[in-house]
Amino acid sequence: MFKALNNCSFFNHLRRGRKKMAEKSKILIIGGTGYIGKFIVEAGAKSGHPTFLLVREATLSDPAKAPLIESFKKSGVTLIIGDLYDHASLVKAFKQVDVVISTVGHNQLGDQGKIIAAIKEAGNIKKFYPSEFGNDVDRTNAVEPAKTAFAIKAQIRRAIEAEGIPHTYVSSNCFAGYFLPTLAQPSGSAPPRDKVVILGDGNAKGITHICCFCFQIIHPF
């Protein structure tokens, strides 16, 4: 299933699905201390859903993560010790919840196959949201480095579908906060000073002709 949702409607979507159940869905977030994950965890706690966060032992002992972890605890989030690379810990965690939300980062996108395998073994997950939160990879023609990342996301989608796991893909398009600090420079950490990298051949158009699109939209009326 394809959906384009923001954080608020993300959990409204879960509420609508919950009408068929007697109580609120229990939600587990993987990667919840990362760039996007922390906002998903916060939204889950505020929504009233029992919210669980999979955390590694190393994360709990990381001083840099301590304030964030403490804020999660104060908001009622339940911490579950586990690891993406520990199959048994994933299965054990999944058996305690109804919904799994993955917010793993770029380097772990391909490793979501481990989540899929654990969901299949647990056998109780009602909905899986893989780490997406960008362009709809089945409808986007990208250049590198995005092309490789999109291909990995597409592979994960096909694996989810092949296993028959109930799912929703959340495609919310680009994040200005991710691209603007570096002026969209790949692997940059600050705005460019000496040169600018232009992806592709430099001739790609974001919008070919806005007027044409407007009249195509109103044509049926």
Across the structure, where does each feature detected by a protein language model lie?
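Oxidoreductase cofactor-interface core, primarily capturing Rossmann-like NAD(P)-dependent enzymes
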Residues: 2, 8, 22-75, 79, ...
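Cytosolic, low-complexity regulatory segments enriched in Ser/Pro/Gly with interspersed Lys/Arg
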Residues: 5-11, 15-19
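An anion/phosphate-binding loop that grips the pyrophosphate of nucleotide cofactors and donors
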Residues: 97
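Receiver (REC) domain switch-region micro-motif
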Residues: 100
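The conserved beta1-alpha1 loop
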Residues: 103
